[in-house]
Amino acid sequence: MREMMSMMKKAKEMQERMQKIQEEMANLQATGTAGGDLVSITLNGKNIITAIQIDPSLLKPEEAEILEDLIMAAYNEARAKIDNALEEKTKSMTAGLPLPSGFKLPF
């Protein structure tokens, strides 16, 4: 019975920590760049694009395909940074909890 109470207490603590992390993540920003900084995209912690910067040299019709590729690459880089930050925060939050391998938070 004590073990169950201890697990319930840890679950409540984890829930409170997760809420705090989610609030912190909402304020996080990451910028991804591509093409030697010709394109940059900034995301917030909810993976919403907050800024896109495109070098004027890419704004030519014949450069459209290159620009599309660079935008995707910059977005993917920024998204990876956000994902890594979330993973690090989650690791620190769940330290010491007996979670199965590959278990991801938030649910």
UniProtKB/Swiss-Prot annotation:
The keyword Nucleotidyltransferase does not apply. It is found in: Cytoplasm, Nucleoid. Its main location: cytoplasm. Transmembrane segments: none annotated. Keywords: Cytoplasm, DNA-binding. GO terms for molecular function: DNA binding. SUPFAM superfamilies: YbaB-like. The keyword Mitochondrion does not apply. One of its GO terms (cellular component) is cytosol. Pfam families: YbaB_DNA_bd. Binds to DNA and alters its conformation. May be involved in regulation of gene expression, nucleoid organization and DNA protection. NCBIfam families: DNA_YbaB_EbfC (TIGR00103). Homodimer. HAMAP family: DNA_YbaB_EbfC (MF_00274). PANTHER family: NUCLEOID-ASSOCIATED PROTEIN YBAB (PTHR33449:SF1). This is Nucleoid-associated protein BT_0257. It comes from Bartonella tribocorum (strain CIP 105476 / IBS 506).
